Each structure stands twice: as C-alpha cells, then as structure tokens.
Amino acid sequence: MSKLQKAGRRAIPIGKLVAPIFGEKMLQNQVLLAVSLAICAAYTGIGMIVPVRVLYAQSRGASLAIIGAMASAYLISNFVFQYPSGWIADRWGRKRIMVISLLAQAALSLAYLFITDPILFVVLRFAEGMAAAATLPSARALIADAVPPEKRGAAYGIFSAFFNTGFLLGPAIGGLLATVSYASVFILAVVFRLAAVLLVIIMIRVEGKTSLEARERARAVPYRALFTLPLIGAYILAFGDYLYLGFDLAIAPIWLHDHLGASIALIGLTYTAWAIPNIITSPISGRLADRTRRSVLILVFGLAQVPLYLVYGLLNTAWPVAVLFAVHGVVYALVQPAVDAHVAASSLADARARVQSLYSAFGLFGSFVGASGLSILYGMNFRLPLFVTGICFGICVIVGGVMIRISEERGNLPAIP
C-alpha cells in the first residue's frame, strides 16, 4: 500500500456528515474526501460566474464578436494545455499542480473586476482555460493514487456527485448575487476557489511524485502506454460523450427557447432536473461499477442514452425535456463512474495525470466538433443536431465499449478490479 493510500484511510469528522449518502467506509479515505470537497467548492465558484460572465462583459462594452471569441479562447487553451499540465503533474506532483491551478483560477476571477478594455476579456478567458486544464486530471489522478483498484468505481461515483453538486449550486448562487452586483459574484467565486486550495493543502498530507526517482520513472513511461487498446476505447467514449456538450454550449438554450417555447426559468429547471438525480445515483452506480463488468455498464447504459437524444429531436414543447433530463441524469450516472474507474485501472501509476489529460482532451475535441458541426446542422433544421448526436454517440459507445470488452477478455485489465 502506498503512503498516499495510507493517508487516505485516516478518518475525519466531516465524513460523518455525508456518510449516510455516500458510505462511511469510502469517506474515511481522507484524500478522496478532500479532492471531492475541493472540486465541489471550486466548481461552485466556476458555476457562479457562468450565468453572469457574458452579461458582465456586455456591461463593460464587449460586442457579440468579443463574447464569441471569449468562448473560443477558453476552449482552445483548455484543449492545448491538457497534456502539458498532465505531464507536469506526473513529474512534480498532482497535489502541487492542483493547488497552483486553483490559485491561478482565483486570481483570474478577481481580474475581471479590473478590466476596462473589452478585448482583454478574450485574453483572460484564454488564461482561464490554461489554468483550468490542470485541475480535473490532477484530481482524478490523486483519487486513483489513494484508492485501491477494487474500490475506484465507488470513489469516482462519490467524486461525480460532489462535482455535479458544485455545478448545481453555483449558478443558483451566482444568479441570486447578480441581483445585488456583478462584483459580488466574482469576489465570492474567489473565496470558493481559495477554500478549495485550503482543503487540498490541509487534508492531503502526503504527496507522491516529489523525489528525483519518481520523476525519472514518470519520464521513462513510453508514449505507447498512453494509447493502449483500453485507453483508446475510453478516449472514443469521451469524444462521443462531449458532442452533446458542444451542442449544449452553443445551441441548447436557443433550441429550448425558440423552438420549444421554454422560459428562462424552465431552461434553468431542466438542468436542475438532470443534476439532482445524477447526484443521487452516482454513488450507487459507483459501487455497482466495482461489482459488475464495467464494459457491460458502459455498453448497456451508454446505448440507453441514444433513444433519449432521438426523442429530444422529436419534441415540440419544452416540459417533456425536464422529465427526460431527469431520466438522462440517472442513466448517465450509471455510466460515468464505470468509465472513470476504467481509465484509472488502464493507466500506469507514473502516467495517470497524462492519461486523464488525454481523456479530457479527446472530450474537449468532441465538444469543438459538436459546437461547430451541430451549429451548421441546426441552421438547416433544429431537429438534425439531436438526431446526429444520438447516432454518433451510439457509434462511439459501441466502438469504445467493444474495445474495453475485448481488453477485459484479453486480460489487459480486470473486468472487475
């Protein structure tokens, strides 16, 4: 057992507060709890800014072209810096890089308040994408370091629940504070990022990857180890999964409002309807991923999402979307912990952050394709993007899921670690 795993088993009082939901034994893992709480706090801060960023930029004179460039700058920099951030984390320590990433995000959130030239918003978003690239890969790698293979499904289920809780709380808090002032939103977002930093520094007391020997081991990992059959399967899944994210970022609110007649309040409700069932289901599905072939969960519940996308494309009113989003949140929760645990099990210990970065990069590439390609289809017919998303996602699930199943059969990784 590694030093980080031993540290992860130290029980702390805060775990007792949420143990009935997530399982007391898992929350005795201090590293898992620290990472989950830190990500929840960080993404609460991120979510707070989401509903006000564009409005704030407009209030400072940003045109629609600048606002579009802001979104592109973030996505491009986040994609470009995924692998470099993982490379650094594998050599210099996941905890250290995660702390630096969170501190940088806090400083950049505060910088919004001092911008007077709208063009600088584009530069700021590029810097935010670069800073954010290191957070999730380092967090997921820390969990893999601290949790035994046979419990990683449950661990990533808990992590997913905390992650989505942050995104659920953030926009609600941000929207409420924006009625007072935009500045208060950015200031509180900084506070949440700093709280995340403190959680990581105080609760994760053992760092790996600090010795020269560890850095040499990380450097010695060949590139082919990052593109094994089970990992390629996971990368394909990430690409297909993020296609809808691109649609969501670029088109979904317009689709709901203009074609299905949804009010702004109902649009917000649809996302809440997705998040709450997902948060509840993720810890349960994580434990299931430790007891069942992960390829089975990925194939069955991945393909179960295909008809949902097709039904979205057939709808003419918005209210059914809220109901279907709730179902979708549950089905998605039954897949994601299995995928996360699979990625962790398929990666070498000295290359975990790089593998996580590549996994995120393939997902971001999928979101690029979704945002650009599906926007063109939307101009032809508003139903086409959803039909195409469903078909492409289904193909990615079949191809990626079969690769993972073949890897299990060959013994490249355990079917049930």
Predicted regions: what they are:
Residues 352-379:
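A late C-terminal transmembrane helix in Major Facilitator Superfamily
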Residues 185-201, 386-401:
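Symmetry-related core transmembrane helices of the 12-TM Major Facilitator Superfamily/SLC fold
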Residues 52-64, 250-265:
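Short amphipathic helix-loop junctions that connect adjacent transmembrane helices
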Residues 75-83, 167-168, 275-279, 283, ...:
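Residue-level signature of mid-helix packing/kink "hotspots" within the transmembrane helices
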Residues 124-163:
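Cytoplasmic helix-loop-helix junction between adjacent transmembrane helices
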Residues 96-110, 296-310:
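Structural signature of the two symmetry-related core transmembrane helices
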Residues 82-93, 281-293, 378:
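Helix-to-loop junctions at the C-terminal end of transmembrane segments
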Residues 11-29, 206-234, 417:
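Juxtamembrane intracellular "pre-TM" segments in multi-pass secondary transporters
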